[in-house]
Swiss-Prot record:
Gene3D superfamilies on file: 3.30.300.30, 3.40.50.980, Luciferase, Domain 3 (2.30.38.10)
Gene designation per UniProt: dhbE
InterPro entries with a match to the protein in the record: AMP-bd_C, AMP-bd_C_sf, AMP-binding_CS, AMP-dep_synth/lig_dom, ATP-dep_AMP-bd_enzyme, DHB_AMP_lig
Protein name, entry field: 2,3-dihydroxybenzoate-AMP ligase
GO cellular component, one term: cytoplasm
Top-level enzyme category: ligase
Pathway stated in the Swiss-Prot or TrEMBL entry: Siderophore biosynthesis; bacillibactin biosynthesis
CDD domains noted in UniProt: 23DHB-AMP_lg
SUPFAM superfamilies registered for this protein in UniProt: Acetyl-CoA synthetase-like (SSF56801)
Residues reported to bind substrate: 234-235, 240, 519
Localization, UniProt: Cytoplasm
Organism: Bacillus subtilis (strain 168)
Keywords tagged on the record: ATP-binding, Cytoplasm, Ligase, Nucleotide-binding
GO biological process, one term: siderophore biosynthetic process
Length: 539
């Protein structure tokens, strides 16, 4: 068992097995089975390249042998930072087959985050593309390696320069160690409201069950053609039902280099895409673009929208613009996933964020004193179930705060439940900014800013934004003369912070409002910036 992993209690695990939730299958088994069943059927389309299920299975075998030859062993962690390219699949399935654990980093992460992931996970390797969207990841790898000289294996998909070329690692398949379905399969990143992301351990058992239920709820089968427009390292496009759900169902995954309509719309037309997933800001962009373009999007049957709350007004436009069914998705990398059902009435689809996908999902809604609220009232969402984790990786202190004694996960979401068990998301309890689906931890950015010599104190809050839902505003108490906002943003970039974490607005103040117990009142700061924005709008 992976050290630092919190397993389900034996009694509950046995219940999930008896109920058929956990079928004893690994991801290696899953791909082998689909290769036998679907053979030459296309699994992955990337540009003009097509990989069949059989070819993907063979490549995973050969790459797993190469990883083992390199010295990567069962339970080793490997930071994988790959965009939407075909190599993503051979890499993760090779690691699954070997029993090594991918740690999924986002393409937008930079040296601060990647160095932390590699160090905290004690990574045996770091896998990157050569360059993507104008950014050279080999340069990033050099920065990371300069801070972590012990990181020896840097593997590159493409032109490797001084690093290891991914393609050269392919070797003759060998006998590999047995992987158990109860083993941790990979580590995902939490949204992170208390600084850098925590790592989320997902097992073969729990994650494959989540795929099975997603496939059933979303009506996927071998005729499904899914466009991966969002970065696949996110849990939502990975498994809700995402690319892995489509492979589970025997369908075809089409990779888009970006979610831009310029890239995505021609692919929908050419590949006859039937389903895709977006975050609300991108759904708005797509709807606006569709009115001025002539792409044939008639193959699209389902548009999923999740990652942040989608307004009812915008939700109502989807069917009129695209002629397809909207499916709202609300979930978390820690587990619980909710969907509106494809045959739900329109009022449920546009006004709720769905209901749990499994009959074994348990939910509680509590007030601030850990008491159940009355039906229909707003409160804190807690959950547990066969695919919701029991603890973060190597995070005892966080686990004590994030989980109840009986294993319910405190999601940090403020919700209310309808009579029919549908969830309406009202906001976040945690100090976290949801910038168009990308979660920004205020504390992480504040800590970086406090390293600037001209900054005495910093407090970052969300501010409303019509396009992204929320943007970030940081309030700064300067030491003497206030620095320029551009200087602070450049400072954060130099420290390797991802672009989406850079504050959208900087306000300089002499002091912060305080709560009754002497803490910074971020509620007052949010109100202050909202009022300022409103006043500016009225002018």
């Amino acid at each position: 068992m992976l050290k630092g992993f919190t397993p389900w209690p034996d009694e509950l695990a046995e219940t999930y097995r008896k109920n058929g939730c956990w079928a004893g299958e690994t991801f290696g088994d899953l791909l082998r089975d689909r290769a036998a069943k679907y053979g030459d059927r296309i699994a992955i389309t990337c540009g003009n390249t097509h990989w069949s299920y059989r070819e993907l299975d063979t490549r995973a075998d050969r790459l797993a042998a190469g990883f083992q030859k390199l010295g990567i062993q069962q339970m080793d962690r490997v930071v994988v930072q790959l965009p939407n390219i075909k190599e993503f699949f051979e890499v993760i399935f090779a690691l699954f087959r070997l029993g090594a654990l991918p740690v999924f980093a986002l393409p937008s992460h930079r040296s601060s985050e990647i160095t932390y992931f590699c160090e905290f996970a004690e990574a045996a390797a770091y896998i990157i593309p050569d360059a993507y969207s104008g950014f050279d990841y080999r340069s990033l790898a050099r920065q990371v390696q300069s801070k972590l000289p012990t990181l020896k294996n840097i593997i590159v998909a493409g032109e490797a320069e001084e690093f290891l070329p991914l393609e050269d690692l392919h070797a003759e398949p060998v006998k590999l160690p047995e992987v158990k379905s109860s083993d941790v399969a990979f580590l995902q990143l939490s949204g992170g409201s208390t600084g850098l992301s925590k790592l989320i351990p997902r097992t073969h058992d729990d994650y494959i069950y989540s795929l099975k239920r997603s496939v059933e709820v979303c009506w996927l089968d071998h005729s499904t053609v899914y466009l991966a427009a969002l970065p696949m390292a996110h849990n939502y496009p990975l498994s809700s039902p995402g690319v892995l759900g489509v492979l589970y169902a025997g369908g075809r995954v089409v990779l888009s280099p970006s979610p831009s309509p310029d890239d995505a719309f021609p692919l929908i037309e050419r590949e006859k895409v039937t389903i895709t997933a977006l975050v609300p800001p991108l759904a708005m962009v797509w709807m606006d673009a569709a009115s001025s373009r002539r792409d044939d999007l008639s193959s699209l049957q389902v548009l999923q929208v999740g990652g942040a709350k989608f307004s009812a007004e915008a939700a109502r436009r989807v069917k009129a613009v695209f002629g397809c069914t909207l499916q709202q998705v609300f979930g978390m990398a820690e587990g619980l996933v909710n969907y509106t059902r494809l045959d739900d009435p329109e009022e449920i689809i546009v006004n709720t964020q769905g209901k749990p996908m499994s009959p074994y999902d348990e939910m509680r809604v509590w007030d601030d004193h850990d008491r159940d609220v009355k039906p229909g009232e707003t409160g804190h969402l807690l959950t547990r179930g066969p695919y919701t984790i029991r603890g973060y990786y190597k995070a005892e202190e966080h686990n004590a705060a994030s989980f109840t004694e009986d294993g319910f996960y405190r999601t940090g979401d403020i919700v209310r439940l309808t009579r029919d068990g549908y969830i309406v998301v009202e906001g976040r309890a945690k100090d976290q900014i949801n910038r168009g689906g990308e979660k920004v931890a205020a504390e992480e950015v504040e800590n970086h800013l406090l390293a600037h010599p001209a900054v005495h104190d910093a407090a970052m809050v969300s501010m409303p934004d019509q396009f992204l839902g929320e943007r970030s505003c940081v309030f700064i108490i300067p030491r003497d003369e206030a620095p320029k906002a551009a200087e602070l943003k450049a400072f954060l970039r130099e420290r390797g912070l991802a672009a989406y974490k850079i504050p959208d607005r900087v306000e300089f103040v002499e002091s912060f409002p305080q709560t009754g117990v002497g803490k910074v009142s971020k509620k007052a700061l949010r109100e202050a910036i909202s009022e300022k924005l409103l006043a500016g709008f009225k002018k």
